Amino acid sequence: FGSLLGICLMTQIITGLLMAMHYTADTTLAFTSVAHTCRNVQFGWLIRNLHANGASMFFICIYLHIGRGFYYGSYLFKETWNTGVILLLTLMATAFVGYVLPWGQMSFWGATVITNLFSAIPYIGQTLVEWAWGGFSVDNPMLTRFFALHFLLPFMIAGLTFIHLTFLHETGSNNPLGISSNCDKIPFHPYFSTKDILGFLAMLVPLTALAMFSPNLLGDPENFTPANPLVTPPHIKPEWYFLFAYAILRSIPNKLGGVLALAASVLILFLIPFLHKSKQRTMTFRPLSQLLFWILVTNLLILTWVGS
Protein backbone atom coordinates (compact mmCIF):
# COMPACT_ATOMS: atom_id res chain seq x y z
CA PHE A 1 0.00 0.00 0.00
CA GLY A 2 3.02 2.28 0.33
CA SER A 3 3.34 2.63 -3.44
CA LEU A 4 -0.40 3.37 -3.64
CA LEU A 5 -0.01 6.11 -1.03
CA GLY A 6 2.78 7.61 -3.14
CA ILE A 7 0.49 7.64 -6.18
CA CYS A 8 -2.31 9.14 -4.07
CA LEU A 9 0.01 11.91 -2.91
CA MET A 10 1.14 12.68 -6.47
CA THR A 11 -2.44 12.69 -7.78
CA GLN A 12 -3.61 14.93 -4.93
CA ILE A 13 -0.75 17.40 -5.42
CA ILE A 14 -1.36 17.61 -9.19
CA THR A 15 -5.17 17.99 -8.98
CA GLY A 16 -4.74 20.34 -6.00
CA LEU A 17 -2.32 22.61 -7.89
CA LEU A 18 -4.70 22.76 -10.84
CA MET A 19 -7.53 23.76 -8.52
CA ALA A 20 -5.46 26.29 -6.56
CA MET A 21 -5.01 28.15 -9.87
CA HIS A 22 -8.76 28.81 -9.96
CA TYR A 23 -9.51 29.12 -6.25
CA THR A 24 -9.97 32.39 -4.35
CA ALA A 25 -9.28 32.31 -0.61
CA ASP A 26 -11.91 34.81 0.47
CA THR A 27 -15.12 34.15 2.40
CA THR A 28 -17.23 36.04 -0.14
CA LEU A 29 -15.68 34.31 -3.16
CA ALA A 30 -14.49 30.85 -2.06
CA PHE A 31 -17.78 29.03 -2.65
CA THR A 32 -18.43 30.71 -6.02
CA SER A 33 -14.82 30.15 -7.14
CA VAL A 34 -15.23 26.40 -6.56
CA ALA A 35 -18.56 26.45 -8.42
CA HIS A 36 -16.86 28.39 -11.23
CA THR A 37 -14.08 25.77 -11.39
CA CYS A 38 -16.66 23.02 -11.78
CA ARG A 39 -18.75 24.84 -14.39
CA ASN A 40 -16.39 26.92 -16.51
CA VAL A 41 -12.91 25.41 -16.31
CA GLN A 42 -11.98 22.68 -18.80
CA PHE A 43 -12.48 19.40 -16.90
CA GLY A 44 -12.72 21.44 -13.70
CA TRP A 45 -15.52 19.20 -12.43
CA LEU A 46 -13.35 16.12 -12.97
CA ILE A 47 -10.32 17.68 -11.28
CA ARG A 48 -12.39 18.63 -8.25
CA ASN A 49 -14.10 15.23 -8.02
CA LEU A 50 -10.79 13.40 -8.34
CA HIS A 51 -9.31 15.63 -5.62
CA ALA A 52 -12.24 15.18 -3.23
CA ASN A 53 -12.52 11.42 -3.71
CA GLY A 54 -8.75 11.00 -3.96
CA ALA A 55 -8.65 12.03 -0.30
CA SER A 56 -10.96 9.11 0.51
CA MET A 57 -8.69 6.75 -1.42
CA PHE A 58 -5.69 8.18 0.42
CA PHE A 59 -7.27 7.38 3.78
CA ILE A 60 -8.44 3.91 2.70
CA CYS A 61 -4.87 3.13 1.64
CA ILE A 62 -3.25 4.59 4.76
CA TYR A 63 -5.61 2.75 7.13
CA LEU A 64 -4.96 -0.53 5.30
CA HIS A 65 -1.22 0.23 5.33
CA ILE A 66 -1.24 0.86 9.10
CA GLY A 67 -3.42 -2.20 9.73
CA ARG A 68 -1.05 -4.39 7.73
CA GLY A 69 1.98 -2.96 9.55
CA PHE A 70 0.23 -3.66 12.83
CA TYR A 71 -0.59 -7.27 11.85
CA TYR A 72 2.88 -8.13 10.59
CA GLY A 73 4.82 -6.38 13.35
CA SER A 74 6.33 -3.74 11.07
CA TYR A 75 6.27 -1.32 14.01
CA LEU A 76 9.51 -2.95 15.23
CA PHE A 77 11.25 -0.72 12.69
CA LYS A 78 10.75 2.08 15.22
CA GLU A 79 12.01 5.02 13.15
CA THR A 80 10.01 3.98 10.08
CA TRP A 81 6.89 3.46 12.21
CA ASN A 82 7.19 6.79 14.04
CA THR A 83 7.76 8.80 10.84
CA GLY A 84 4.72 6.97 9.48
CA VAL A 85 2.57 8.06 12.42
CA ILE A 86 3.78 11.65 11.93
CA LEU A 87 2.81 11.28 8.25
CA LEU A 88 -0.68 10.15 9.31
CA LEU A 89 -1.07 13.15 11.63
CA THR A 90 0.08 15.54 8.89
CA LEU A 91 -2.32 13.92 6.42
CA MET A 92 -5.21 14.31 8.87
CA ALA A 93 -4.35 17.97 9.38
CA THR A 94 -4.13 18.52 5.61
CA ALA A 95 -7.49 16.83 4.99
CA PHE A 96 -9.14 18.90 7.71
CA VAL A 97 -7.87 22.29 6.49
CA GLY A 98 -8.71 21.29 2.90
CA TYR A 99 -12.27 20.39 3.85
CA VAL A 100 -12.82 23.97 5.06
CA LEU A 101 -11.76 25.63 1.80
CA PRO A 102 -14.95 25.34 -0.34
CA TRP A 103 -16.69 27.29 2.46
CA GLY A 104 -19.92 25.31 2.37
CA GLN A 105 -22.10 24.83 5.46
CA MET A 106 -20.34 21.71 6.73
CA SER A 107 -16.92 23.21 5.93
CA PHE A 108 -17.72 26.21 8.08
CA TRP A 109 -19.30 24.36 10.99
CA GLY A 110 -16.73 21.59 10.93
CA ALA A 111 -14.02 24.24 11.19
CA THR A 112 -15.92 25.97 14.00
CA VAL A 113 -16.35 22.77 16.02
CA ILE A 114 -12.81 21.44 15.59
CA THR A 115 -10.98 24.74 16.17
CA ASN A 116 -13.17 25.25 19.24
CA LEU A 117 -11.74 22.06 20.74
CA PHE A 118 -8.51 23.94 21.43
CA SER A 119 -10.41 26.05 23.97
CA ALA A 120 -10.57 22.92 26.16
CA ILE A 121 -6.84 23.31 26.89
CA PRO A 122 -6.49 24.88 30.36
CA TYR A 123 -5.22 28.48 30.71
CA ILE A 124 -4.12 29.06 27.10
CA GLY A 125 -7.11 27.48 25.33
CA GLN A 126 -9.18 30.57 24.60
CA THR A 127 -6.15 32.60 23.49
CA LEU A 128 -5.10 29.72 21.25
CA VAL A 129 -8.50 29.58 19.54
CA GLU A 130 -8.60 33.34 18.92
CA TRP A 131 -5.06 33.11 17.59
CA ALA A 132 -6.05 30.28 15.22
CA TRP A 133 -9.13 32.21 14.07
CA GLY A 134 -7.27 35.50 13.68
CA GLY A 135 -10.25 37.17 15.38
CA PHE A 136 -13.27 36.36 17.49
CA SER A 137 -15.09 34.12 15.03
CA VAL A 138 -14.45 31.81 12.09
CA ASP A 139 -13.97 34.30 9.27
CA ASN A 140 -11.74 35.47 6.43
CA PRO A 141 -8.38 35.40 8.27
CA MET A 142 -8.91 31.74 9.12
CA LEU A 143 -9.89 30.80 5.58
CA THR A 144 -6.78 32.43 4.11
CA ARG A 145 -4.43 30.76 6.59
CA PHE A 146 -6.14 27.40 6.06
CA PHE A 147 -5.57 27.79 2.33
CA ALA A 148 -1.90 28.57 2.96
CA LEU A 149 -1.61 25.50 5.20
CA HIS A 150 -3.45 23.27 2.75
CA PHE A 151 -1.02 24.36 0.04
CA LEU A 152 2.03 23.86 2.24
CA LEU A 153 1.35 20.62 4.12
CA PRO A 154 1.27 18.21 1.13
CA PHE A 155 4.84 19.22 0.31
CA MET A 156 5.74 18.58 3.93
CA ILE A 157 4.11 15.15 3.54
CA ALA A 158 6.23 14.55 0.43
CA GLY A 159 9.38 15.46 2.38
CA LEU A 160 8.42 13.21 5.30
CA THR A 161 7.74 10.40 2.82
CA PHE A 162 11.38 10.51 1.74
CA ILE A 163 12.50 10.35 5.39
CA HIS A 164 10.09 7.44 5.92
CA LEU A 165 11.59 5.60 2.92
CA THR A 166 15.16 6.38 3.99
CA PHE A 167 14.54 4.76 7.37
CA LEU A 168 12.88 1.79 5.66
CA HIS A 169 15.89 1.32 3.37
CA GLU A 170 18.15 1.15 6.44
CA THR A 171 16.53 -2.14 7.45
CA GLY A 172 14.85 -3.46 4.32
CA SER A 173 11.15 -4.26 4.33
CA ASN A 174 9.29 -6.76 6.46
CA ASN A 175 7.43 -9.88 5.26
CA PRO A 176 4.47 -11.97 6.48
CA LEU A 177 6.75 -14.45 8.29
CA GLY A 178 8.72 -11.68 9.99
CA ILE A 179 12.05 -13.32 9.10
CA SER A 180 15.03 -12.09 7.05
CA SER A 181 14.20 -11.95 3.36
CA ASN A 182 17.78 -11.50 2.11
CA CYS A 183 17.81 -14.94 0.43
CA ASP A 184 14.57 -14.13 -1.43
CA LYS A 185 15.60 -10.83 -2.99
CA ILE A 186 14.59 -10.37 -6.64
CA PRO A 187 15.07 -7.50 -9.14
CA PHE A 188 12.65 -4.60 -8.70
CA HIS A 189 11.90 -4.56 -12.42
CA PRO A 190 9.95 -6.40 -13.87
CA TYR A 191 8.67 -8.10 -10.70
CA PHE A 192 7.77 -5.37 -8.21
CA SER A 193 7.12 -2.79 -10.93
CA THR A 194 4.43 -5.07 -12.41
CA LYS A 195 2.94 -5.75 -8.98
CA ASP A 196 2.84 -1.99 -8.27
CA ILE A 197 1.19 -1.20 -11.63
CA LEU A 198 -1.50 -3.77 -10.82
CA GLY A 199 -2.04 -1.99 -7.49
CA PHE A 200 -2.23 1.41 -9.21
CA LEU A 201 -4.91 0.10 -11.57
CA ALA A 202 -6.83 -1.53 -8.72
CA MET A 203 -6.93 1.86 -7.00
CA LEU A 204 -7.24 4.30 -9.91
CA VAL A 205 -10.10 2.42 -11.63
CA PRO A 206 -12.44 2.66 -8.59
CA LEU A 207 -11.29 6.25 -8.03
CA THR A 208 -12.13 7.37 -11.58
CA ALA A 209 -15.38 5.39 -11.44
CA LEU A 210 -16.30 7.15 -8.19
CA ALA A 211 -15.30 10.59 -9.53
CA MET A 212 -17.21 10.07 -12.79
CA PHE A 213 -20.38 8.25 -11.72
CA SER A 214 -21.16 9.25 -8.13
CA PRO A 215 -18.75 11.97 -7.05
CA ASN A 216 -20.95 13.12 -4.16
CA LEU A 217 -21.48 9.67 -2.66
CA LEU A 218 -19.06 10.28 0.23
CA GLY A 219 -19.57 14.04 0.56
CA ASP A 220 -22.03 15.90 2.74
CA PRO A 221 -25.06 17.47 0.98
CA GLU A 222 -24.83 20.40 3.44
CA ASN A 223 -21.76 21.55 1.52
CA PHE A 224 -23.95 22.52 -1.45
CA THR A 225 -25.19 25.39 0.72
CA PRO A 226 -22.81 28.36 1.14
CA ALA A 227 -21.55 28.87 4.70
CA ASN A 228 -23.99 30.70 6.95
CA PRO A 229 -22.84 31.52 10.51
CA LEU A 230 -26.47 32.05 11.58
CA VAL A 231 -27.80 28.60 10.65
CA THR A 232 -26.38 25.48 12.28
CA PRO A 233 -26.78 22.26 10.23
CA PRO A 234 -28.85 19.55 11.99
CA HIS A 235 -25.92 17.11 12.16
CA ILE A 236 -22.37 18.39 12.23
CA LYS A 237 -20.06 15.57 11.21
CA PRO A 238 -16.70 15.22 9.44
CA GLU A 239 -15.89 13.18 6.33
CA TRP A 240 -16.17 9.39 6.82
CA TYR A 241 -12.44 8.90 7.45
CA PHE A 242 -12.57 10.94 10.69
CA LEU A 243 -15.84 9.48 11.99
CA PHE A 244 -14.19 6.94 14.31
CA ALA A 245 -12.30 9.74 16.11
CA TYR A 246 -15.34 12.03 16.07
CA ALA A 247 -17.47 9.28 17.65
CA ILE A 248 -14.90 8.97 20.44
CA LEU A 249 -14.93 12.75 20.92
CA ARG A 250 -18.72 12.94 21.06
CA SER A 251 -19.14 9.94 23.37
CA ILE A 252 -17.35 11.65 26.27
CA PRO A 253 -19.47 14.27 28.08
CA ASN A 254 -16.45 16.29 29.28
CA LYS A 255 -14.90 18.63 26.68
CA LEU A 256 -11.26 18.20 27.71
CA GLY A 257 -11.75 14.46 28.24
CA GLY A 258 -13.19 14.13 24.75
CA VAL A 259 -10.32 16.06 23.20
CA LEU A 260 -7.77 13.92 25.05
CA ALA A 261 -9.52 10.70 23.99
CA LEU A 262 -9.67 11.94 20.39
CA ALA A 263 -5.94 12.71 20.42
CA ALA A 264 -5.13 9.43 22.18
CA SER A 265 -7.07 7.40 19.59
CA VAL A 266 -4.40 8.31 17.02
CA LEU A 267 -1.36 8.97 19.22
CA ILE A 268 -1.66 5.46 20.72
CA LEU A 269 0.16 4.34 17.56
CA PHE A 270 3.39 5.82 18.98
CA LEU A 271 3.20 3.37 21.91
CA ILE A 272 2.77 0.20 19.87
CA PRO A 273 6.49 -0.59 19.40
CA PHE A 274 6.89 -0.61 23.21
CA LEU A 275 3.93 -2.96 23.73
CA HIS A 276 5.40 -5.81 21.67
CA LYS A 277 6.32 -8.61 24.07
CA SER A 278 6.04 -11.71 21.86
CA LYS A 279 9.00 -13.81 20.67
CA GLN A 280 7.47 -13.80 17.19
CA ARG A 281 7.30 -10.68 15.11
CA THR A 282 4.11 -11.18 13.09
CA MET A 283 0.63 -12.33 14.05
CA THR A 284 0.72 -15.07 11.38
CA PHE A 285 1.05 -17.84 13.99
CA ARG A 286 -0.56 -16.10 16.97
CA PRO A 287 -4.32 -16.83 16.98
CA LEU A 288 -5.03 -14.88 20.19
CA SER A 289 -3.32 -11.74 18.86
CA GLN A 290 -5.20 -12.21 15.59
CA LEU A 291 -8.49 -12.31 17.47
CA LEU A 292 -7.63 -9.09 19.32
CA PHE A 293 -6.50 -7.47 16.07
CA TRP A 294 -9.78 -8.24 14.30
CA ILE A 295 -11.75 -7.06 17.34
CA LEU A 296 -9.86 -3.75 17.03
CA VAL A 297 -10.73 -3.53 13.31
CA THR A 298 -14.39 -4.28 14.05
CA ASN A 299 -14.35 -1.65 16.78
CA LEU A 300 -13.08 0.99 14.36
CA LEU A 301 -15.73 0.04 11.79
CA ILE A 302 -18.49 0.19 14.41
CA LEU A 303 -17.23 3.59 15.64
CA THR A 304 -17.23 4.86 12.05
CA TRP A 305 -20.81 3.64 11.61
CA VAL A 306 -21.96 5.06 14.96
CA GLY A 307 -20.25 8.39 14.27
CA SER A 308 -22.40 8.98 11.21
UniProtKB/Swiss-Prot annotation:
Binding positions for a ubiquinone per the UniProt entry: H169
Positions with a binding annotation for heme b b566: H65, H164
Cofactor(s) required, per the database record: heme b
PROSITE patterns from the UniProt entry: CYTB_CTER, CYTB_NTER
Keywords: Electron transport, Heme, Iron, Membrane, Metal-binding, Mitochondrion, Mitochondrion inner membrane, Respiratory chain, Transmembrane, Transmembrane helix, Transport, Ubiquinone
Ranges that cross the membrane: 1-21, 45-66, 81-101, 146-166, 194-214, 256-276, 288-308
Signal peptide: none
GO molecular function, one term: metal ion binding
Gene Ontology terms describing biological process: mitochondrial electron transport, ubiquinol to cytochrome c
Free-text comment on the cofactor: Binds 2 heme b groups non-covalently.
Compartments, record wording: Mitochondrion inner membrane
Membrane topology listed for this record: Multi-pass membrane protein
One GO cellular component term: mitochondrial inner membrane
Entry binding sites for heme b b562: H51, H150
Pfam families named in the record: Cytochrom_B_C, Cytochrome_B
Source taxon at top rank: Eukaryota
Subunit structure: The cytochrome bc1 complex contains 11 subunits: 3 respiratory subunits (MT-CYB, CYC1 and UQCRFS1), 2 core proteins (UQCRC1 and UQCRC2) and 6 low-molecular weight proteins (UQCRH/QCR6, UQCRB/QCR7, UQCRQ/QCR8, UQCR10/QCR9, UQCR11/QCR10 and a cleavage product of UQCRFS1). This cytochrome bc1 complex then forms a dimer.
Extra information: Heme 1 (or BL or b562) is low-potential and absorbs at about 562 nm, and heme 2 (or BH or b566) is high-potential and absorbs at about 566 nm.
Summary of the function given for this chain in its UniProt record: Component of the ubiquinol-cytochrome c reductase complex (complex III or cytochrome b-c1 complex) that is part of the mitochondrial respiratory chain. The b-c1 complex mediates electron transfer from ubiquinol to cytochrome c. Contributes to the generation of a proton gradient across the mitochondrial membrane that is then used for ATP synthesis.
Family: Belongs to the cytochrome b family.
Protein name, entry field: Cytochrome b
Organism: Asthenes dorbignyi (Creamy-breasted canastero)
Taxonomic path: Eukaryota, Metazoa, Chordata, Craniata, Vertebrata
Gene giving rise to this polypeptide: MT-CYB
